[in-house]
Design a protein with these regions (language model features):
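N-terminal signal peptide c-region/cleavage motif recognized by signal peptidases
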Residues: 11-17
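Extracellular carbohydrate-recognition regions
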Residues: 17-43, 126-133
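Extracellular beta-strand elements of beta-rich domains used
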Residues: 24, 213, 231-235
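Extracellular/lumenal carbohydrate-interaction signature centered on repeated Trp-anchored short motifs
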Residues: 75-86, 179-182, 206
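Extracellular/luminal beta-rich ligand-recognition
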Residues: 108-110, 118-166
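Exposed low-complexity, polar/acidic, P/S/T/G-rich flexible segments that act as propeptides
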Residues: 113-115, 228-236
């Protein structure tokens, strides 16, 4: 994902009304604002392709990643301190050959749903705190200090929790893994407080405010070509 976590974590800004997330729906080809595309700084890679489509009598976001990188981000301003549950449906149609989340060379995902938190930098271990400060300086972005990314990854056992290969400030939760049949819809519901404490419980005893939610895919490291769908994404 080469520096991809910088773009992935860089979210803060637009006002959000009730419901907390604008739906992945609508008559257009892309979700309505405040959903917006976020790429790498000065990205030269192909962009991940997003499109609203009708599939199985429902509206869904189609995500295609031909050796690409890209995210759709929904910022919450001010960050929301009350939300505790995230739910959605998703379907992996085409997996990424060569993806391996535990290695930088394979740090790709055919589909990911991520939550970014306004976690206090003072709670980080000293070395990670200094790394994040440097990353913020170099990127020019107020990068959050914690993020959870839920992925569908046939290379990992379902239930795995892994640090990102580039930074421990991002943790992967593999919800659908090896043995999960592709081409079928799966429904997810996550207790964000429980997941955050599982990932970062040594730094905090409560869930920080949520600054953004994103949906994305990348295949820039593995050189693959993934295809997936996400629908009915709700934060409450």
């Amino acid at each position: 994902m080469k520096r991809g976590w910088l773009a992935l974590l860089a979210a803060a800004g637009s006002a959000a009304a009730q419901p907390l997330l604008a739906p992945l729906d609508g008559p257009g080809s892309l979700p309505p604002p405040p959903w917006r595309e976020v790429l790498l700084p000065k990205q030269t890679l192909p962009r991940t392709r997003f499109a609203l489509v009708d599939i199985d009598a429902a509206r869904a976001l189609r995500i295609e990643s031909p050796r690409s990188y890209g995210n759709l981000v929904h910022e919450l301003a001010p960050p929301d301190a009350a939300a505790r549950q995230l739910s959605w449906r998703w379907r992996l149609e085409r997996a990424l050959d060569g993806a391996a989340l535990q290695r930088k060379a394979g740090d790709d995902a055919a589909v990911k749903v991520c939550v970014l938190f306004e976690h206090a930098i003072a709670r980080l271990p000293f070395f990670e705190r200094q790394q994040l400060r440097l990353a913020r300086l170099l990127s020019g972005e107020p990068l959050p200090a914690a993020a959870l990314c839920y992925v569908w990854d046939p290379q990992q056992p379902a239930g795995s929790v892994l640090p990102n290969a580039y930074t421990r400030r991002l943790r992967w939760f593999v919800l659908q893994g090896s043995g999960s049949p592709i081409g079928h819809w799966r429904s997810e519901q996550r207790d964000l407080r429980a997941d955050f404490l599982r990932a970062f419980g040594d730094e905090a005893s409560e869930l920080p405010p949520i600054s953004a939610v994103l949906v994305g895919a990348d295949a820039d490291n593995s050189g693959g070509d993934g295809l997936a769908y996400v629908a009915e994404l709700e934060l409450r």
